[in-house]
Structure formats: structure tokens, C-alpha cells
């Protein structure tokens, strides 16, 4: 009897141990599932917060970029309008840049503007007044330089400038291209153009000028590429006006260079006759004064206005 009772106690104790072990395993499994669920939920919340932060950053960057290119569109439209008014309003207005190449000095204006904007960096003021002054300066110097060319040459230069400008911006915004492929594309394009120029039937003077133009514009586009990448990734909102002016000055510099390249009259300009046209105007003015012609004209005009008023 004692043996049977002992066996029963042993069996009951083993059953209790089995139940305790099973309950412990169930509890551990429950805790593990809860921990896994909390880990998954925390990962999901972290992923959702990261996605939302990326979306907010992308929207902010897009808004900044849209402001920059919106101002660039306004600047370009104003410059085109001023040049069109000069060409259409004064079709007979011409300037013999081959005899007096002084207007060609206006092509240095975009270089000076770019130097002022790039070298001063954060110290350069960025407000509406600075924006208006730079836009007016570049627009009127472009209109003055257009006096050395005809309207078809100006339109051709504008189309070529926009083509180069848009192509460079497109390559800069293409994130899927690695830096190696970008450099290879730029170098191969530059070499292809230069080889095509050297293989052409132009004179050596024309070939030299075209090769210099290609190298110069290539350097401008390389700087433009870096500026566009900065605008796309790192530019703060306080530099919107400054960055739009940099793009506008770069576009104007490409246009001036292309216009001078497509104007054959400039190639044979007499640099020893600089400002000779202004000197002739001054001589003619003194001639009118010395001969009393100017006073006669003024007196006649005054008498005419007085008679009309009476």
C-alpha cells in the first residue's frame, strides 16, 4: 500500500511539474510574441516617421527650387522684353562695332556680376533692391550688346544658349547618373565638338575661335553644373535670390559669348578705334555750338512751342 501511495505521489508531482513547465513555456511564448509585436510596431513607426520626414524635406526643397527657377524665368523674360523693344522700337538703330568695338566691353558685365555673387557668398545682400539692380544691369547691357548683331543672329544665339542651359540643368538633376558617367559624358561631348570643328573646312582663324568658344563655354557649363547641384541639395532658403541671379548671370554670359561668336563683324573689329564713335559725336556737338547751329535749332524749337501755346 505504501508503495502504491508513493507511486501516486510521484506521478502527481511529475504531472504538476509538467503543467508548470507547460505554463512557463506558454508564458515565455506569450512574452516573446508581445516583444516581437512591439518590435515590429516600433520599426513600423520609425519607418513611417522617416518617410514622413523625407516627404516634408522633399516638399521644402521642391518649393525652394521652384522659387529659384521662377525668379530665373522672370529675369530672362525681362531681358528678352528689353532686347525686343530695342529691336522693334528702333529698327534703324545700328552700331558699327567693326569701326568702334566699345559696346563689346559690355560682355564683361556678367563676369563681374558672377564674381561679385560667387566671391562674397554669405556676405552678399539678398533682397529685392539687389535683385532689381542686377536684373536691370544685365538686361540693359544685353540690349546694348545686341546693337552689334542683327535680330536673326540674336534669336539664334538665344536658342543655342537655352539649349546648352537646359541640357546642363537636365544632367545636373539626373540623380541616377554617377559622377564618373557625368564626367565621361561632358568630356566626350567636348572632344567631339572640338574634333568636328578641326575637321571642318573653315579657316584656321575660324577653327581657333570656335575651339576657344567651345572650351570657354564648357568651363561655364562645368561651373553651372556645380551651382545647380548646390541648389538641388544644400541651398538654404535665404539664398534664393542670390542663386537665381547666379543662374541668370551664367545664362547671360553664355548668350553674350555665343552672340559674339556668331557675329563675324566682331572678329575684324578695330580695337585701336575704341570709343571713336563717341568722340565723333562730341566733335559734332562742338561743331554745332561753334557754328551757332545748335542755338538756332533751340531758338526755332522754343519759338514753335510758344506759338503753339499761344
Swiss-Prot record:
Residues 1-28 are annotated as: Disordered. Residues 1-13 have a biased composition (Low complexity). Keywords: Glycoprotein, Membrane, Transmembrane, Transmembrane helix. Glycans are attached at residues 291, 299. It comes from the Viruses. The chain crosses the membrane at residues 68-88, 101-121, 125-145, 147-167, 185-205, 208-228, 246-266. It is a multi-pass membrane protein. One of its GO terms (cellular component) is membrane. Its main location: membrane. It is found in: Membrane. Belongs to the cytomegalovirus US12 family. This is Uncharacterized protein HVLF4.
